[in-house]
A protein has these predicted regions:
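N-proximal low-complexity "stem/linker" segments adjacent to membrane-targeting elements
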Residues: 1-58
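A conserved acidic beta->alpha catalytic loop
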Residues: 73-84, 93, 102-104
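Short acidic, S/G/P-rich loop/turn micro-motifs used as interaction or catalytic elements
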Residues: 44-49, 76-78, 151-154
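Active-site-proximal specificity loops/subdomain of glycosyltransferases
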Residues: 89-138
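Short loop->beta transition adjacent to catalytic acidic/histidine clusters or analogous donor-positioning motifs
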Residues: 36-37, 61-71, 94-95
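Short beta-strand-to-loop acidic/aromatic patch adjacent to the donor-nucleotide binding site
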Residues: 141-150
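Conserved small/polar residues in nucleotide/adenosyl-binding loops
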Residues: 182-189
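Conserved donor-nucleotide/metal-binding helix-loop-beta segment in metal-dependent transferases, i.e.
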Residues: 156-176
Length: 190
């Protein structure tokens, strides 16, 4: 059996070279009318000062099919949370920042701890857990994608390929995992 055979409801990112990024994004925009897409970005404040996240935000700004973005912000004081808000305002997609070290999430975490529902340890898992909770509470997304904020080789094709298998109504996938990193943009996208 070939390595790209897909059985079941889980897909892995593949690049068969059949569609350009623009073609995939055009279809995603069409699908977005009926199938809202939301992106989760769990990040540390320190990543705002690195090289990867500014590029990721720049690439996301080139997309037009996302309905909403949830940013989970960790390890940020109040001043840094304000700076993060200013940083992410450049996105042209509506967004929500969950400031994990802020008073509102600390209060929520305390309430959930009393009921045995809060993640035990701080970190990316907890960050993602709260972001998924926000997505569920918003109840508008048909598909949710999540990726790290330290991908140095990020380009918008990665995001398109994360959503495409689960948003395309001709496919029966419920989950898509990414495992391919592209050191440079695809020649088809030039």
């Amino acid at each position: 059996m070939s390595e790209f055979s897909q059985n079941g409801i889980v897909s892995t990112l593949h690049d068969f070279g059949t569609k350009s990024t623009k073609e995939i994004e055009k279809e995603l925009l069409k699908f977005s009318n009926e199938r809202k897409m939301e992106l989760i970005l769990p990040c540390l404040y320190s990543e705002l000062e690195g090289k990867a996240l500014p590029n990721i935000v720049s690439e996301i700004k080139k997309t037009n099919y996302l309905d909403h973005i949830i940013i989970g912000l960790d390890k940020a004081n109040e001043d840094q949370a304000r700076k993060a808000w200013t940083f992410f305002e450049q996105l042209e997609t509506p967004f929500t920042i969950l400031w994990n070290d802020g008073p509102n999430l600390k209060k929520l975490d305390k309430e959930l701890k009393k009921k045995g529902l809060s993640p035990n340890e701080k970190g990316k898992g907890r960050n993602v857990w709260y972001c998924i909770g926000m997505s569920i509470a918003r109840n508008t997304a048909r598909s949710v994608a999540l990726h790290d904020c330290d991908i140095k080789t990020y380009d918008r094709r990665m995001l398109a390929k994360l959503f495409y298998p689960v948003v395309n109504p001709l496919f029966n996938f419920e989950f898509c995992k990414g495992c391919l990193l592209y050191p440079s943009p695809s020649p088809r996208d030039s």
